[in-house]
Amino acid sequence: MYILTIIKNIKLMKNITLVYSSIFSFIFITCNAQVKLNDIPLQDEVKNYTLETVVSGIQIPWGMTWLPDGTMVVTEKTGILYQVKDGVKTEIKNLPKVYNRGQGGLLDVVLHPDYKKNGWIYITYSSTEGEGDGGNTKLIRAKLQNGSLIQIESLYKASPNTTKGQHFGSRIVFDKEGFIYFSAGERGDHFVNPQDITRDNGKIYRLNDDGSIPKDNPFVGKEGAKEAIYSYGHRNPQGLAMNPFTGAVWEHEHGPQGGDEINIIKKAANYGWPVVTYGIDYDGTSISTESEKPDIEKPIYYWLPSIAPSGMAFVTSDRYPDWKGHLLVGSLKFQYLELVKLKKDTIIGRQKIAVNIGRVRNVAQGPDGYIYIAVEGKGILKIIPN
């Protein structure tokens, strides 16, 4: 009888422990559920367009641009550079060796604003060159001749290398004055790189078109500083675009779990990572208890929960009257395109486009005025208004 009583008590204690465990799990999940108070509502899409496949068979299309004759140049993350004409893709030869690991690989591609005269194409990719094992983000320029890259010039290589697979960035954009900006993520060393201007990574860089350092860069002459740095305190910027209406460079970056940001890039500005963040770590623990601090630039908008943004483009085309003057951002996580409605530098509305299309890696407005989206596993699609 005594033994039976002990067994019953043990079973009861197990049940009580299970109940308490469930309660604490519920409390933990509830407390860590990410809700942004007074957020701008995300409107459902109004499908007044059709989608047309421009080219298929590109598994992770990352960057895209257009030659003067309308030929597209597309990067595929694993390390293939394509030119696409009339739906047919052809591999461009003589690409430097790409370090294809994790989130690294062949990344962005843009043309020089005066491409018709000088023929320069700019590319970022992860490279093994330099100090240490692994790789880091590199910027080159080259010319295209007879389907092959020639006159390849190294413009900047972040260092040291690391075998970590995350946060390479990278996007490239020219401003109205002809300076080139490119991004490099913090390579997974968020307590080391982003806040230290003597180290690469977690930065937006600004260079002359030949890779030299502009004399008015903010950290020129500062002892030990990487003089190419224009802004710092970034996590993993995968959106970079010049606002055609103001000339300012806009950026978006991945937060951790929550806290993806849209920022307007300012000279010498600190964007806070990881000192401040609106997100939490992937295990639910806190990275920082603060989301704002003096002398740290606040984002003009942040997503909570994360959408995992990739690619961004301002719409200037008359083909899309309801979208003109606003911003498009791809979502990897939720697999749609987000129309971010603007009133000058203020976000006033949000709307879904191309719902369930797949992981949107990039978005761009072509020289023909159409919007093109790069979707993982599908290739490049064109949005045609009805």
Per-region residue spans from a language model:
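Short edge-strand/loop segments of extracellular domains
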Residues: 144, 254-260, 264-271
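Loop-centered beta-sheet repeat module
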Residues: 198-207, 216-248
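Beta-propeller blade signature
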Residues: 137-147, 197-209, 265-266
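Conserved blade-ending motifs and adjacent loop-strand segments that build the rim/top face
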Residues: 347-367
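Acidic, Gly/Ser/Thr-rich repeat motifs that build Ca2+-stabilized beta-propeller blades
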Residues: 34-190, 239-242, 247-255, 305-343, ...
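Bacterial Sec-dependent N-terminal signal peptides
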Residues: 1-36
